[in-house]
């Protein structure tokens, strides 16, 4: 089980939001690259970046901070990024800068042809971010609920050739209420590509619960507010996940 620290970028700073509300941002660091180094030193094997301004603006907005993070740790571990990615040129530029994966969310739902083109042009580097509430997909920085069922879109995007799916329960994100295990497993069973859980991770019990269903196709989990607030010790959580994996393999 891959535990992936999230670095959410707003105005060049590392922040956390509550349920995607830009007005409810807590600043955790004014040096995102230093924060990236911190998580790598704590044992992170991948980083998850979100350009929050970009997600709302529909185009990249925190490129300096993103490049600084890639320069700091991109040679050591994979770095993935979502937010404001709406065209192939942006994807190409980010991959050339050293990103390992780009995450397409709203644009995949609104313009499936773009996702299909991205998967064709940059195979192995495209992750789809599906954000949902009560099984319905949300777009535009979570501000709009669609009528699309998560599993239906996931199967469609799998056919396009995306690498994996990040599934975020937006009713829980930033609320420390626990991962929606049931919904995540349901999605993982609907597709053959890996699913990464997101939204609500709060403690070691969540890690244990996820590890129990890892073989359903759940590759990892995004770690957000809990590792910043101190509710979850990241290094201890990754160690626990590794130990549980080893005991399962034994």
UniProtKB/Swiss-Prot annotation:
GO cellular component, one term: cytoplasm
Gene Ontology biological process terms, A to Z: L-histidine biosynthetic process; L-tryptophan biosynthetic process
MF term (GO), any: 1-(5-phosphoribosyl)-5-[(5-phosphoribosylamino)methylideneamino]imidazole-4-carboxamide isomerase activity
Annotated Pfam families: His_biosynth (PF00977)
Subcellular compartments: Cytoplasm
Catalytic activity reported: 1-(5-phospho-beta-D-ribosyl)-5-[(5-phospho-beta-D-ribosylamino)methylideneamino]imidazole-4-carboxamide = 5-[(5-phospho-1-deoxy-D-ribulos-1-ylimino)methylamino]-1-(5-phospho-beta-D-ribosyl)imidazole-4-carboxamide
Enzyme Commission designation: 5.3.1.16
Pathway: Amino-acid biosynthesis; L-histidine biosynthesis; L-histidine from 5-phospho-alpha-D-ribose 1-diphosphate: step 4/9
PANTHER family xrefs: 1-(5-PHOSPHORIBOSYL)-5-[(5-PHOSPHORIBOSYLAMINO)METHYLIDENEAMINO] IMIDAZOLE-4-CARBOXAMIDE ISOMERASE
Protein name in the entry: 1-(5-phosphoribosyl)-5-[(5-phosphoribosylamino)methylideneamino] imidazole-4-carboxamide isomerase
Organism, as annotated: Paraburkholderia phytofirmans (strain DSM 17436 / LMG 22146 / PsJN)
